[in-house]
Amino acid sequence: MKDNTHSTTLIFFGNEFPNDDLKGLFRCLLRLSKDRRFRQLAAFLEESTLVLKKEVAALPQPLRDLVPHFHTVLPLAELGDFRQGPLGAAMESALLTVLELGMFIGHYEAEGRDWNLLEHNTTLAGLSIGLLAAAGVALSTNLAEVAQNGAECVRVSFRLGVYVSEISRKLEAPQADGTLLSWAHVVTGETKSAIQDELSKYNSESGTPELLKVFISAADKTSVSVSGPPSRMKACFSSSHLLRYSKSFALPVYDGLCHASHLYNEDSINTVINSAESVIPVSRPVQLSLHSSNTGQPFPAATAHELFQAIGKELLTGTIYLDNIIDGIIKRIEGFNPSDLQVETFRTSIVFKSVRAALEGEFPDLEIKITDLIPWAFRDYGPRLPRSFAHSKLAVVGMACRMPGGGNDTELFWEILEQGRDVHTTVPADRFDLSTHYDPSGKTDNAATTPYGNFVDKPGLFDAGFFNMSPKEAEQTDPMQRLALVTAYEALEMAGVVPGRTASSNPKRIGTYYGQASDDWRELNASQNIGTYAVTGGVRAFGNGRINYYFKFPGPSFNVDTACSSGLAAVQVACSALWAGEADTVLAGGLNIITDPDNYAGLGCGHFLSKTGQCKVWDETADGYCRADGIGSVVIKRLEDAEADNDNIIAVVLSAATNHSAEAISITHPHAGNQKDNYRQVIDMAAVNPLDVSYIELHGTGTQAGDAVESESVLDVFAPRSPPRRPDQLLQLGAVKSNIGHGEAAAGIASFLKVLLMYQKNMIPAHIGIHTVINPTIPKDLEQRRVRLTQTNTPWPRLPGKKRIAMVNSFGAHGGNTTVLLEDAPERNKDVARENRSTHTVVISAKSKKSLQANIANLALHLEENPDIDLGDLSYTTCARRIHYTLRVGFAVSSIAGLKEALRKAGEKEALAEVRPTPGDVPPVVFAFTGQGAFYQGIARELFESFSYFRDEVLQLDHIVQRLGFQSIVPVIDGSIGENPSATVSQLSIVVIEIALAHLWTLLLGMQPSAVIGHSLGEYAALVVAGVLSTADGIFLAGRRAQLIEKCCTAGSHAMLSVRASVSEISKLLGNAKYEISCQNTLNDTVIGGTKANLDAARQVLESSSIKCVPVDVPFAFHTEQVDPVLDQLTRVAETVHFKAPSIPIISPLLRSVVFDGKTINSSYLIRATREPVHFAGAIEAAQDLGMVNDKTVWVDVGPHPICASFVRSLIPKARVASSCRRNEDNYATMAKNLVALHLAGCTPVWDEYFRANEKAYNLLTLPKYAWNDVNYWIQYIGTWTLDKAHLKYTGTNGPPQVKPSSSALRTSLIHEIIEETIGEETATLKTVSDLQHPEFLEAVHGHRMNNCGVATSSIWTDMSLTVGEYLYNKLAPGSKVHMNVGELEVLHATVANPAKNCTQNLYLDAHLDLRTQKMSLAWFNVDPATGSKAAESYATGSVRFEADAEKWKSEWERLTHLVLGRIETLESMAKDGQASQLSKALSYALFKNVVDYADHYRGMERVVMHDYEAFCDIKLTPERRGMFHTPPHWIDSVSHLAGLIMNGSDASNTRDYFFVTPGYESFRLLAKLDPDVKYQSYVRMFPLPEANMYGGDLYILQDNQIIGMVGHFKFRRVPRLLMDRFFSAEAASKQSVAASASSAPKTATKHAPLPASKPAQAPAEPTPSSLPTVQAQNTSPPQQVTPSKPAMNGVKTPEEEKPGKADAEGPNGTTSQPEATGVVGQCLQLIANETGQSVNELTPDATFVQLGVDSLMSLVLSEKFRAELGLEVKSSLFLECPTVGDMMDWLEQYC
């Protein structure tokens, strides 16, 4: 016996299932396998599922059909009594193996133990199938191997069961009635030999063949198991007196014989094991001993193959001897000599009790510990830690809706449900006219047969400006899409989603999924007069696509149509995206707005609709459904993300699935079986017991077929008669359609929202669908099955420690079934500590003044209604969990009462008038670092104590301080330093705290400085932040400097005095007194220094002149002679430090300049800065002169007290300053006030970081939603044309001519594809498309660059004209020789190359040639890159005249040749005399670069002579054509761009303030094609044209002193240079909508442009019905005669409405007088007056901008001036959309 005192382990695998609920055990395994704490369990279950799938697939078809589809083993366990049928043995064997190994693996993972039984004395034993489970452990060294090996055990178990059943059924067929008969009995009280005698006697006397004999399969001391075919067994026991009267019982062995050596042989074993299909290596070694149930000894197997062969042999042919097993185990344990014995098993059994009794009897002194491997599965492990996205639960965190009957938000929707209201009505007049479109008899074609429906109030209400839509776009956009945007926003707002705030809110990971099943608006309302936005506003995909576009979500965007289930199907698809990892946050919902009577007619004809009213769900009189509007949106993310993001979780989605009723009797008929399949799928996915579901929201349409089938499917799965529900398991049902009707595509989302609200309100609202009695097709035993259709409001409490499970159903008329399973949100830990902030920030914003005012008022009202609201939570919600807009108010308050007062003041008219929009660009920020004069004890104490980031930063810096040999500065912060700390400690504390504060501002709060300035000691922190010094070097230098001052200077011998006077005043008063200027802080704030005695004397003199003097509380006189002794030593210290170039500019008070380079600041600089004065005022002035700082710059004082801030305010009175800390003020109070100030200035802090350290201590509040500035955009359906079309007749022959697709191969570098070609007798039409991003086209464009952008030059349009002209003319008149005169070229908008890579930028060209006029017209169009649609209006037009007689041109030019040559000779002469400028090629194009940067191949001018607006040049064309052209653009440009050089380079032009661009020319003619081998000259004289800002001239092209070409009436427009960025930029390129280029110029618009994107529709945020303006197409006649309303004010005022205050604005003669304009309106009017040359008094409200001379160019200038000078972001189209001064004043008052 070994001398070993280690613990020994016995693991026993039985052959019986535990007595627990088997399905419940498998649900536990599946549910826990989704948690990453049970990775090996998951791996085992997945591998087992795969091997079972493979084995099932190998079965014959009849057997395969018996097995349901399964993704996990759970459906197999839920088959019911799987013992029935030919696969009973296989299923029982496999499931027992899965259960035992799964419980084994899970137990060890739950205990957190690394399973390594090889280090212990471990032995394994098992009985029957348990041996196979034990084999999985015997072959393993760790849990991961158990998972792999276990799958092989499952495979063999399944095969064993299949084989045994197959063989046994050949011995005796099963009972016809399905009765299960046992193949084994246990006999007790008799010996094995006695029983064997009886069996032998029976087998012999009955003549039973050996194959069918009755035999002993197992034996022990007290019992014997007898096996055989059931009928033979029965006969044997009947014939034997011994057996008939013995104590015996049947074993649950129903599928055949094992342990039968007479039946099976070696081939049988090989068939079962089938090693060739093994999923593990057959040579894998055996690691642990496994006892044979026959011999009791360990199997003598060395490999997996040998072990499975031995087990297979024993199971098929070996007799079980329990006594041998017990003896073998005892001997094994004795061999280990253990100190204790660990026994692990699965519950208990008769066999295990015998084993245990034997062990306790054999080892009475041994501690035996029995471990059950089952209970771990029932423990609560807290929130699931999903091992992958697919195993996450999902959290619904936001919701919003527009429901019928006034359910315009979720609270109002709940009121409808809680009050049990039925909201159906007749069809409102704004949808269609019931008097003409309703016929209950059904005789009128296309008429509705029911007048009823459920409708959203005023679905046209929309805040167009908020969503950057013009009124016309809003009007044409389907209200479904509009309200999808609105509810998406409201749901996101409720969820506190700020894009980019967290990983799960990364915009690229947010997707949208919306269900929609109809197109009423597009097909009816908008189609009456199809407009620009017919496609983008009506096609379904744009509904969710617009949400992605507006919010800039690059994630997935899907529009889902599954008929009536679309809304919930969209939720399911969205959930699937989360589970698949395709998105991290999803918006999902359903949309339905009814306007089209056609759908009423169609549904009526199909007998879908009730003619009596509302949906009567489960009522006996149910006769169809009642249609309904509905819009709903929800925000869903993975549960773990929601918890990490501190979201409010409304409910949790466990699973969701969709299938189809494919087996129904018709496509619209439901199918109970398919519905049940879907239910089982969701409960299996969630591993939920269906009996635990306590509420089901029915689809419940109120149709006879639908209600009957749904009741059957629901009850069969969730309330079966067996097993029945317990008394405490009441299942309650309801259907929202009985309240709000059937919302079709929105029905599912309405049901979903109802259940979410139930979770919120803890109540099940009454089902009001039963009007008479319950439908007789519904099962009668609802009460017996514990099912109730709740007809009263019923509490639905959440019990402690439990979760309510609910299910939502939604079925589509096409057959789709969607089901979602939900449970309660996790209970939130409310014991998280929060930092003690004395003051809190609260901010509110909006996009319009009216919305802002309403938002303020709504919050104030909310505070009144919720007096217990937590101020910290409110701060967190409004700051960190809201998107912030340009109109802002903010408060730093310490109480709710203080906030109420602040809101009251902010909501006053005067206060709102002062609110200005924050600038579009973040203002520059300068950090100012204060010097030692700001020192005090307890600096930043509150931040250090409770702001973890700041504390950690300080401690890291203090660690550096101490490692450098200095004393810790922490005592300065906590106040424990004592009185009069050393200069070293005080100065280092300043530097350290300022560095920490700077990091707080930059890294945490998001303030990125554009420059830094340090005052005296503060410069060390500034240099660290600017990257010149490392943190360690900065601290080292500051500390050593302080030590040297303490060492070399005497404290108190010198002093510093702050004097409220200028340097010159002080000098004048003090004369020759001894003092030094230490600091010049402002023009009238100077610090002087010197000996104490000298300063006392100076102070007396100054104060005697009434000049205020304040001693500076410092022990030394810095920047004076007192520090001279330290300079040499400090120099040596500083020279050891490495200085780097600044990463941001440094405003230097020493140099009074701004430092950008890496050489200026060095050791010498620091020495000078120590000794020389601090010229703070001079430094600021230098930064102002450079334009680095101005009135808009935001200054952050980074120091203990805002000393620098006061200096900045004095130097720049309008400066916006913020401070970090303030002496004698709580840090949080200071921080809060200044964060709000920065926020209002447009420097939005990273609010999330301000709360992040203790975010879990804050609660996201549900606050009033954003107050929309709504207008009712509605196109009313006019007339009866949906009825009339039923009577239209078609002749079918007279249609438009068919356009024959072109087979032409016209393709050049600029013309890429013909998309349409029509050739007639005398006319021809050609439509082509070109991609500007094509390499050859792009090269031509980039040859002409403006503002670093490639801009298409007019020579490109010229070549395209010549190319198309030649092509079409040859088509109509082949072989004809003509000359082409390109003319009337007018380019309205520039074409700028999009800088994005791998994009397309298509242009359309339409050309029409008429031989009768010998003229071709051309028009160029942009293409919308998103839709591929051609723009409605062209951006360029031109023509080509075909002239056969070129002699006319020659004659014309010969008369002019001598004049042109004479002017050239004159210019040559003037150049020789110095009166004209002679420019080389290089100089000419360098001068051109002022506006245009030409590529080398465009540079054809060799020499230029220019005087004022006249010039000629010598030209040499580059030889390369560089592509396929008619005439290369770079050649055309070379011979013609002399005119552009004159305008943009001549001394006569004001090129500083303006640049010049060409909108085109009247004609371009060449007698012969340009030739690179020919030398040319060009001559032009430009002159002003009568049209304002326009110049023109004729440009002549000469060859050998003969005119051979001409650009006639070449025009140029003067454009303010400040518009360069607007016209020529990457943004302009992407929009393709700029107004001018070197080849195009702005033109006065002939049509109104859309409203500015920032302009919301003009209406009160909460309009009353009587005052609500309505936007609708003014259709009073058939659609083709519709006259559109005025775009500028569409929907804002009807003709009957008077403008408020109109009567008061009229003067005595009825003329309109100018009201006094103040604030931003007054500033804008003054600016307009300055630019237009008008008097402000002339800008009366009725004055139009056309009258004032504001054309499109001037409007661009004004919008740019508004931005630059007033900080207002307005679009130039404002002056078109607001045609009068009064209109514009109204707009400014509202939005600025």
UniProtKB/Swiss-Prot annotation:
What molecular functions are annotated in GO for this chain? Answer: 3-oxoacyl-[acyl-carrier-protein] synthase activity; fatty acid synthase activity; phosphopantetheine binding
The UniProt induction remark is:
Expression is induced during late sexual development in the dark.
EC number(s) per entry: 2.3.1.-
Q: What class of enzyme is it?
A: transferase
Q: Which residue ranges does the record assign to the Ketosynthase family 3 (KS3) domain?
A: 391-824
Point out residues bearing the modification O-(pantetheine 4'-phosphoryl)serine: 1752
What the entry lists under Gene3D superfamilies is as follows: 3.30.70.3290, 3.40.47.10, ACP-like, Malonyl-Coenzyme A Acyl Carrier Protein, domain 2, Polyketide synthase dehydratase
Q: Which gene encodes it?
A: aptA
Write the protein's name. Answer: Non-reducing polyketide synthase aptA
Instruction: Give the residue ranges for region: N-terminal hotdog fold.
Output: 1312-1447
Enumerate composition-biased segments (Polar residues). 1664-1684
Q: Which PROSITE patterns match?
A: CARRIER (PS50075), KS3_1 (PS00606), KS3_2 (PS52004), PKS_MFAS_DH (PS52019)
GO BP term (any one):
fatty acid biosynthetic process
Question: Which portions of the sequence form the region N-terminal acylcarrier protein transacylase domain (SAT)?
Answer: 1-395
Question: What role does this protein play?
Answer: Non-reducing polyketide synthase (NRPKS); part of the gene cluster that mediates the biosynthesis of asperthecin, an anthraquinone pigment. Catalyzes the formation of the aromatic polyketide from acetyl coenzyme A and seven malonyl coenzyme A molecules. Through its product template (PT) domain, catalyzes the cyclization of the polyketide backbone via C6-C11 aldolcondensation. Polyketide is subsequently hydrolyzed from the NRPKS by the action of the hydrolase aptB into endocrocin-9-anthrone. Endocrocin-9-anthrone is then oxidized into endocrocin by aptC.
A Pfam family cross-referenced in the UniProt record is SAT
| Ranges of Low complexity composition bias in the record | 1634-1649
What's its catalytic activity?
holo-[ACP] + 8 malonyl-CoA + acetyl-CoA + 8 H(+) = 3,6,8,9-tetrahydroxy-1-oxo-3-(2-oxopropyl)-1,2,3,4-tetrahydroanthracene-2-carboxyl-[ACP] + 8 CO2 + 9 CoA + 2 H2O
Q: What happens when the gene is disrupted?
A: Fails to produce asperthecin.
